[in-house]
Swiss-Prot record:
Alphabetical UniProt keywords: Cell membrane, Membrane, Transmembrane, Transmembrane helix
Pfam families in alphabetical order: UPF0114
Transmembrane segments: 15-35, 53-73, 136-156
Topology versus the membrane: Multi-pass membrane protein
Localization per record: Cell membrane
Classification via HAMAP family: UPF0114 (MF_00143)
GO cellular component: plasma membrane
Coiled-coil parts of chain: none
InterPro entries (alphabetical): UPF0114, UPF0114_bac
Protein name, as recorded: UPF0114 protein PST_0950
Major subcellular site: membrane
Family classification: Belongs to the UPF0114 family.
Amino acid sequence: MERILENAMYAARWLLAPIYFGLAFALLALAIKFFQEIFHILPMILSISEADLVLTLLSLIDMALVGGLLVMVMISGYENFVSQLDVDEGKEKLDWLGKMDSSSLKLKVAASIVAISSIHLLRMFMDVQQIDSEKLMWYVIIHLTFVVSAFAMGYMDKITKH
């Protein structure tokens, strides 16, 4: 009975596979929005203000960071919790493939969240006259919470490995 239960629990990890595959659709949706933003800005490129252009570029950078985060979680999560990816060495194999454990994935996700939060905060500062000071204060507090959390996770990871 114990053996059957353990085998069933181990096999249950495959329930994560469609979830990780679903992240590929999320990446596709993000790519569509990215190019929608590009096609939206191109006709206005010569008449748009510098500040609006910078805000648009920050949005594009934000989407690129989220896309990288999706790929990292999708591939590393699959490899860590479902099965190893069998990618031929001759193909464009990602350097970190097979080397990122759940701890390093957690740190990379935290760093990505801090970077994404930084871009959102920068966008807020670009339009600071239009934003309520209390709302801006909460954005800063939330961002600092992300920064402190990422730092704490990195520190905890460092002291537990030594």
